[in-house]
A protein has these predicted regions:
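Acidic, histidine-bearing metal-coordination/catalytic regions of metal-dependent phosphoesterases
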Residues: 1-108, 123-128
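Active-site neighborhood of divalent metal-dependent phosphoester/pyrophosphate hydrolases
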Residues: 95-168
């Protein structure tokens, strides 16, 4: 199965996960404050192929790094498969330092963009261990045909970026 997880809307007590699989899946998210030690988990969730699902992990502690992974299986299957471990940090205390990255104008939807160069840029940003990333636009190119673009075309543009954005 191919999947992507994109994190967003972090607060001092929660974070939103957007999860997308390419097959009909059952899964849960395991998470905790020590690498490899997941004391918390969500209920088992069901997702249809190629439809992103957003949900919040709530009741988190501020200024804390959480480690998480998915446990997933084909809908109706018996054995779960663990994903690699990922992490995030909840909002830091006011006045404390943090790290963020900025990216813009990658233009992967037209001849100006280069997938491998964008991948290298994201890998370099990841080395900074950012708390979050700001994107300043020209991400999807949906404004190039503003009056004629279809919902299906928008869905494809957005789906093409998930593998990139899920890595930071």
């Amino acid at each position: 199965q191919k999947y992507s997880v994109i994190l967003g809307r972090p607060t001092d007590k929660s974070i939103t996960l957007s999860v997308l699989f390419d097959q009909n899946i059952e899964y849960q998210v395991e998470y905790g404050i020590q690498s490899g030690n997941y004391l918390n988990k969500t209920a088992i969730l069901t997702e249809n192929a190629n439809i992103p699902k957003e949900f919040d992990l709530e009741g988190l502690s501020k200024n804390t790094r959480y480690f998480y992974r998915l446990q997933y299986r084909i809908k109706g299957g018996t054995n779960f498969t663990p994903s690699p471990e990922y992490s995030f940090i909840t909002a830091r205390d006011p006045g404390s330092s943090f790290v963020f990255t900025v990216e813009a104008d990658e233009h992967l939807y037209d001849k100006k963009g280069v997938d491998n160069m964008y991948r290298i840029c994201l890998e370099n940003q990841l080395k900074d261990k950012p708390d979050f990333m700001l994107s300043l636009g020209d991400t999807f190119g949906d404004d190039h045909n503003a009056t004629t673009i279809t919902s299906a075309e928008l869905k494809t543009l957005h789906a093409n970026y998930r593998p990139f954005l899920a890595n930071i």
